[in-house]
Amino acid sequence: MQTKFNYVKPSECNIDYHNLINYAKRLENQDIPMHSLIIMRGNNICMESYYKPYDNNSLHRMFSMTKSLVSLGIGCLYGEHKLSLDDHIVDYFKDKLPQNGAYDYMKMLTIRDMLTMRTCHDSTTYKTAGITDWVGSFFTVKPVHAPGTQFSYDTSSTH
């Protein structure tokens, strides 16, 4: 499936051109190493710029993209009122819970906790030897603290 994007003036996206220019200048003034900047609304591209030595054909290695994409998807579902950030994550993954039921801390874990990396684990769960089900490991590895109380960079929470 390929989506066609339209190139339009920022005003056609209800965006002030001067705000886009000021934003781009602010990034540059703060020495943020930009490769590209694309501003879209719907299927419309309102601004597209590239920073030397990069151009629209430059390839990039991508790391930790799952977190961004999952967060975007959750935001869309939240905007459509299909879920709440305070929903308990175990309600969405009943088939991944241990046979004897979820741990108490796991039952308390919310989508909000997951998005903010304040889960009940203090490390990535699927890196334990012998684990092949990354999603399942999140629910079967014993939690170490109450959710929402500690930040821990945890890749398994987004998988």
Where are these regions (language model features)?
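A short, well-structured edge-of-sheet supersecondary motif
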Residues: N19-D55
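A generic structural signal for nonpolar/aromatic side chains embedded in well-ordered alpha-helices
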Residues: A24-L27, M114-L115, F138
